[in-house]
Amino acid sequence: MDDLKQKYLSQIAAAQDEAGLEAIRLAAVGKKGEVALKMRELGKMTPEERQVAGPALNALKDEINSALAAKKAGLADAALDARLRDEWLDVTLPARGRPRGTIHPVSQVTEEVTAIFGEMGFSVAEGPRIDTDWYNFDALNIPGHHPARAEMDTFYMTRAEGDDRPPHVLRTHTSPVQIRTMEAQGAPLRIICPGGVYRADYDQTHTPMFHQVEGLAIDKDISMANLKWVLEEFFAAFFEIDGIKTRFRASHFPFTEPSAEVDIQCSWIDGQLRIGEGDDWLEVLGSGMVHPKVLAAGGIDPDQWQGFAFGMGIDRIAMLKYGIPDLRAFFDSDLRWLRHYGFASLDQPTLHGGLSR
């Protein structure tokens, strides 16, 4: 019995793999193994012999099975160690790069404009893109015969046959937001109104849908001098040019009186626009003192309050600042264009941290 025990325990200890270990198990404790054959011989023994041999064989079988299990676990651990050595991963290596999206220039410039005017105390106001012609035209002192109300310039919403109510329009500017905010908040007031607007025009510098930001400030003693200061501060911060020169030219808008178009100093060198230098001028926005009729339409007494307003194209000033040649490309959804002109998602513009890259 001891010889049999030593034989198989030594074979188990010397086994190199699970296949060899299984062969030893079958030879030792399998149905036709040596221990099983010894068990069958118990029937030929006397009772006294069986009382001695039976427990010894069971103990041998248990010991061999324990040795087999321990060896199998050891082989599995060794195989795992070998696999880990062969397939190890250096966790200090940089991760594989993931495709990253970019912030559209319109979104970025909107955030830049909001940050600048936010430092001056302006809050953001928003309103519907589909509005009544009263908010879009009448409340802004734009009469029925004005060219802007023609179907060739404005997108009108059709009504069901027999519905005689005034038509809705896709707003042609964000000025209706000013009227709604005056109605809701009264005076004093200091807001900017960024958002999408719609006009029936399409060429290199015009698209049927584009983006505007308009500003409105109403108080007791506001004047054109305040308007001039606000716009010059904005241009200096937005274009990041100290002392940028501006020029106010008399103009006419139905909703402001007096009205002025505002130009900024620029030059053209080898076909490249340079802002803040040279002897040329570039128109960038319209502005003026809010017309008394517009204040009255917003529920504000023009004898007690006055204010200034201005408006500019977000897409246009984005083109000027970042050298984008064609407005239509803003809406083409071209990933190559977006990767080139887009901004990192964490580029949050602030006056103190920097507006642009």
Swiss-Prot record:
UniProt family annotation: Belongs to the class-II aminoacyl-tRNA synthetase family. Phe-tRNA synthetase alpha subunit type 1 subfamily.
Cofactor binding remark: Binds 2 magnesium ions per tetramer.
Organism: Roseobacter denitrificans (strain ATCC 33942 / OCh 114) (Erythrobacter sp. (strain OCh 114))
Identification of the protein by name: Phenylalanine--tRNA ligase alpha subunit
EC supergroup of this enzyme: ligase
Assigned keywords, A-Z: Aminoacyl-tRNA synthetase, ATP-binding, Cytoplasm, Ligase, Magnesium, Metal-binding, Nucleotide-binding, Protein biosynthesis
UniProt EC number: 6.1.1.20
Catalytic activity as recorded in UniProt: tRNA(Phe) + L-phenylalanine + ATP = L-phenylalanyl-tRNA(Phe) + AMP + diphosphate + H(+)
